[in-house]
Regions:
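A generic structural signal for well-ordered coil/turn residues at beta-strand boundaries
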Residues: 29, 54, 79, 86, ...
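Short Gly/Pro-enriched turn/cap motifs at secondary-structure boundaries
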Residues: 21-24, 98-102
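C-terminal helix-coil-helix/basic helical segment that borders enzyme active sites and/or dimer interfaces
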Residues: 199-206
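Helix-rich catalytic cores of soluble enzyme domains
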Residues: 40, 46-49, 60-64, 114-115, ...
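Short helix/loop capping segments that flank catalytic or ligand/cofactor-binding pockets
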Residues: 43, 50-52, 92-94, 118-121
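DPxDG-like acidic metal-binding loop motif
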Residues: 45-89
Length: 206
């Protein structure tokens, strides 16, 4: 829904306002778009679109092409536009055959020369593209991914470290005379792990 702030108001309303269950999902892969009258011709082959089975719209991060070459913006960087496509118009490629994380339903889809109206595209993370301004939408989407993923990783690391410290109170390795917590090597490694975890947390928050 962060993309709602860069979409045209009527498009944002169509996706997230008119439908209480409206949602947008996307994933990585190869995607290109060529400007045509009133919009873009999109060709893509995308995968790992987590949440796509629950979404009502899908996104495709397309490299913009001009004469077959990537377009460059004023900053010299390749122009990438996110195309917003109704899920009802695509066929899901079932590729998410996994043991873990099955519920994410991270399947994919492909399109060839598919027309997307100009209004159904956005450029993410550019202040000048915002159609709705609020402090929340100045936070970059890449930072949302980073904070979300790293927060989970640090939570797992913290739980594992606490579990190990609890284990070390009574655990005595075979042939050892003392429990783990009395071992100076273990003490040093736990201290290093604590320091690294705290440093990562400080880096993320600060």
């Amino acid at each position: 829904s962060m993309s709602a702030a860069t979409a045209q108001p009527d498009v944002a309303r169509l996706i997230w306002g008119d439908d209480p269950a409206g949602g947008l999902a996307w994933g990585p892969g190869k995607a290109t778009a060529v400007p045509v009258d009133d919009g873009y011709s999109v060709t893509c082959d995308l995968a790992f679109c987590s949440g796509m089975h629950n979404a009502t719209w899908l996104g495709a991060h397309c490299i913009m092409l001009e004469d077959g070459e990537p377009m460059k913006g004023a900053d010299g960087k390749t122009v990438v536009r996110t195309m917003l496509i109704p899920k009802s118009e695509i066929k899901i490629n079932v590729i998410w055959d996994v043991v873990g994380l099955r519920a994410t339903g991270s399947d994919g889809y492909a399109l060839e020369d598919y027309f997307v109206p100009a209004a159904h595209s956005v450029i993410r993370d550019k202040d000048e593209e915002l159609t709705y301004r609020a402090p929340l939408y100045l936070f970059r989407q890449t930072n949302l991914f980073a904070s979300g993923f790293s927060g989970v990783a640090m939570g797992i690391a913290h739980s594992m470290l606490q579990a190990f410290k609890k284990l070390s109170i009574d655990k005595r390795p075979r042939l050892a005379k003392t429990v783990l917590k009395e071992n100076t090597v273990v003490q040093a490694d736990v201290a290093l792990a604590e320091a690294r975890l705290n440093a990562a947390r400080t880096f993320l928050i600060s």
